[in-house]
């Protein structure tokens, strides 16, 4: 792991985000009401969806809780997935951050601070109550996160009641919240614009 410096991207059209894939985690199907009959079906669906959307040269930020299992299993998953992969460490990831795993990511960090097309974005595993730039109106920073397993179809998380307090520029990029598929920067931008419009704000 290395200290993260802010990355700037002038074109966000091939940048993607995801979180909480929990590959190899049998019990996540029950815990989060995921619509799969086995962990094999779960894993293969997530891998298929990822590779259909993310190309080999695209950039994807994974915001933590990538997989369960051994170092070998992690490396096998990573070798099957498209894209230049960045990992923001989740609470379940620490035990598997071996040299063999880390070298399969462009970068591994507890937090990332990026800028895409002039938008400042904090990337964390957990949602924050406040973050730098949150109060700047139309020029507000974003915070993208995972961990809470938001679902548009079911209340599957203990944090459901607290999530009403999020800023309009925060969004859960977790796989439960996005049809078990990575979400693009442009799709996140559309979601955040809708949230901002609910307060009479809009960003082009």
Identify the residue ranges that each predicted region occupies.
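Conserved beta-sheet core of the metallophosphoesterase superfamily
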Residues: 103-203
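Acidic, histidine-bearing metal-coordination/catalytic regions of metal-dependent phosphoesterases
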Residues: 1-37, 171-204
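Histidine (H) residue identity feature
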Residues: 4, 22-25, 42, 62, ...
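Core catalytic region of metal-dependent phosphoesterases/phosphodiesterases
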Residues: 8-9, 16-18, 23-115
């Amino acid at each position: 792991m290395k200290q993260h410096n802010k990355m700037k991207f002038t074109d966000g059209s091939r940048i993607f985000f995801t979180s909480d894939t929990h590959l190899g985690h049998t019990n996540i199907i029950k815990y989060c009401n995921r619509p799969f009959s086995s962990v094999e079906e779960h894993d293969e669906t997530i891998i298929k969806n990822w590779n259909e959307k993310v190309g080999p040269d695209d950039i994807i930020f994974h915001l933590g809780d990538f997989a369960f299992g051994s170092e070998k299993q992690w490396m096998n998953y990573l070798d099957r997935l498209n894209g230049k992969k960045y990992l923001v460490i989740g609470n379940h990831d620490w035990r598997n951050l071996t040299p063999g795993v880390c070298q399969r990511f462009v970068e591994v960090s507890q937090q990332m601070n990026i800028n895409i097309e002039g938008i400042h974005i904090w990337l964390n595993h957990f949602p924050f109550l406040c973050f730098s730039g949150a109060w700047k109106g139309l020029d507000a920073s974003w915070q993208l996160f995972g961990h809470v397993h938001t679902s548009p179809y079911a209340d599957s998380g203990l944090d459901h009641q607290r999530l009403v307090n999020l800023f309009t520029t925060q969004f859960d990029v977790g796989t439960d919240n996005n049809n078990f598929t990575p979400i693009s920067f442009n799709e996140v931008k559309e979601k955040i614009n809708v949230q901002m419009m609910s307060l009479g704000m809009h960003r082009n």
